[in-house]
Amino acid sequence: MVRATGSVASRRRRKRILKQAKGFWGDRKGHIRQSRSSVMRAMAFNYMHRKDRKGDFRSLWIARLNVASRIHSLSYSRLINGLKCANISLNRKMLSEIAIHNPEGFAEIANQAKKALEATV
């Protein structure tokens, strides 16, 4: 009886791993056993860092808003509180973009937040 090796599927599977290991250094790019473990590790880091990226961007937006709001004599937390009191529902990404690309518009938003804070006190 003919021996079934599954060679086509095996070759395809190995080639896929080696293709993903392109750019790795040393044996990691050419030997299937090292490549497989390196690719799995890289994929795990990739997954983790895709999740981390969301928080990284949020931190960046908050830092930008803190700088922009302090120009208008508000802290970041008082700016956000004032916006909530004024019923202005802009997210941090949008506020950050406004602060960078349209400082006059951000000044108006900050003034509305200040007025709302003064009204609540």
From Swiss-Prot:
Return one Gene Ontology term, BP aspect. ribosomal large subunit assembly
The alphabetical list of record keywords is: Ribonucleoprotein, Ribosomal protein, RNA-binding, rRNA-binding
Give the matching PROSITE patterns.
RIBOSOMAL_L20
- Name a single GO cellular component: ribonucleoprotein complex
A Gene Ontology MF term for this entry? rRNA binding
Give the Pfam families listed for this entry: Ribosomal_L20 (PF00453)
Q: Which InterPro entries match?
A: Ribosomal_bL20 (IPR005813), RIBOSOMAL_L20_CS (IPR049946), Ribosomal_protein_bL20_C (IPR035566)
Q: Where is the signal peptide?
A: none
The protein's matches in HAMAP family, at most eight in alphabetical order, are given as:
Ribosomal_bL20 (MF_00382)
Regarding protein family, the annotation reads: Belongs to the bacterial ribosomal protein bL20 family.
Q: Kindly give the PANTHER family that the UniProt entry links to this protein.
A: 39S RIBOSOMAL PROTEIN L20
Describe the task this protein carries out.
Binds directly to 23S ribosomal RNA and is necessary for the in vitro assembly process of the 50S ribosomal subunit. It is not involved in the protein synthesizing functions of that subunit.
Q: What is this protein called?
A: Large ribosomal subunit protein bL20
Gene (UniProt):
rplT
